[in-house]
Amino acid sequence: MSTGAPDSGHHERAVVTEERARAFLAAGELELLGRIPWASNATVLAKVTHEGLEGLAVYKPARGERPLWDFPSGTLYRREVAAYLVSERLGWRLVPPTLARDGPLGVGSVQLYVDADPEVTAFELLADEHPALARIAAFDVVTNNADRKAGHCLAGPDGRVWAIDHGLCFHVQAKLRTVLWDLAGTRLEAGVLADLESLAAEAAGGGPLAAALGELLDGDEVAALARRARALVRTGRLPAPRGDRAYPWPLV
């Protein structure tokens, strides 16, 4: 994952570690390049510069969130950050480095930009039976993702698959909407189940993860995360769709 191409001889292109990426996003200067037009909320492509490095990030300011009837106003950016923390705790590294910080349009989430192939979505990855999708589907179950569109699965230049756009996650009521229902019934690997069991214990146990999530979500949402993880461990399989609102719209 690259931080992006340079625009002068004074900047260098860098492949960054997770820790370095977070420091880069936290301390870097944000220059807004333009709004990403297909996003439903204000989503801005930004150039980040810090200590001779420059790269791209996706900035989602709280003030640009559209009001929703089922998610509290001004919380979507925090859900983006919470999804990253869950991904990291699981050890799956599905979500690009993401953090909350102040920016030119106020506080919001800042996520390292993934230079992905625009022709590859979850539909193409499903057709190729990419192994990362089962973990993404499990991740969506436990985070209760209400908006897993096909375009929210990105194929990076190294073949790695990333999951983005998690502002509509962590609701206490069942809201799972995804294009990954083709994987329903898939038995999850033992290692995946062990990761989920550990996540459930930590989310419910009042330790560092629970504390970090508690700064981003309310207590009921953190408790619901733990319950969903435990339930998925008990069944050991990805669930089937329920009801008539199982798919996001648009699909891509």
How would you name each of these model-derived features?
Residues 6, 67, 72, 96, ...:
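Proline-rich intrinsically disordered, low-complexity coils
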Residues 6, 10, 115-137, 230-252:
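Repeat-unit-sized solenoid/scaffold elements
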Residues 156-252:
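C-terminal catalytic region of ATP-dependent kinase domains
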